[in-house]
Amino acid sequence: TGGTYYLHVLTVDNTENKKEVISERIVITSVPKNWKKTTSNDPEWYDYGTEVNAPKLGTGMTPIVYEGANKPTEKKWANAITEDGSMWVWIPRYAYSITSGYHSSSTGTIEIKFLKESSNVAYDGTSTWDNVSGQGKWNIHPAFNYGQEVSGIWVAKFEASPEGATTSTSNSEYNGTGKKLQVKPGVSSWRSITISNIYDVCKNYNSALNSHMMKNDEWGAVAYLSKSKYGKQNEEVWINNSSNHITGSAGNSASASQDTGTTTDYTSTQGVKASTTGTVYGVYDMSGGAHEYVAAYVNGENNRLIIYGKALINGETKTKNVYEKASRDYYED
């Protein structure tokens, strides 16, 4: 069983002298069901279908591979766990182009070119980018900057929940910073918490890993990659329609009404359709689930920003996206 342990050894010699030794802290990570630990040089760890930046494992992170039913052979985004058993997915640095459907209500298409390390040079050799809005324009995705350019980002595989969460919604309704978050399937996600407290809880999770509340552009980076040929592409991510907000759940269609045909088995044939890849290796809960907030706001001096998002407003620039108020935005209260 995963947890923190200490080895306690008591020895007694021939003259009955006793010696007691207590070891340093030993952390045993609980591996999710149907997954196993692996190494960073395991060729089975990930496969994006093309060359990408190797995932950067932070302190306490361990690569994992899936060993259960519906084991895919492609669209395997890298997965890892932290010491508490939380699950994370690697999004490699890339540039993108919206090739159809730009500023349209119709389903569009997105092309992706993965970039080498923290540079702006693609693996196919492309090094010149438009970096302006518009259909067919190529842009370096802004999510890959956290105070400096980065080679990729780790994102939560499921909606966050408080440690000790169960399938009971009451256990996951907490508006405070006294609990630690986790990222696990099959439990009710964290709700009834202010944006300011979300910001602090995420920052407090693991400072060594630069944990933070997901920014708007980081959420977008996951969505855009899912829409490319390296994700579900032309098939919509199915909705998590669980009324109890059970992480990793899936309805029986992309737009299923609440609790209609819901499965809580994210590894099942139906469950993987709610993943960004259509396989067990993707990110879940991107559609449906609980209401989600990102670390972003319009800088319009709205009083509610101060009331509910003080920590976010006072946070470091790299931890948030701030947008300027448009000339027609007159809302002050």
Regions inferred by a protein language model and the residue ranges of each:
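N-terminal module-boundary/linker segments of secreted carbohydrate-active enzymes
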Residues: T29-G136
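Short, conserved beta-strand/loop elements in beta-sheet-dominated catalytic cores
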Residues: M87-V89, R93-A95, L209-A221, Q258-D333
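Extracellular recognition modules
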Residues: Y6-V12
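Surface-exposed, short loops/turns at beta-strand junctions within beta-sandwich domains
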Residues: T1-T4
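Extracellular fibronectin type III
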Residues: T15-S30
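Acidic glycine-/aspartate-rich tracts in secreted/extracellular proteins
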Residues: N14, Y94-S97, F158-P162, A296-N299
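Short aromatic-cysteine micro-motif
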Residues: D84-G85, T107, E117-M286
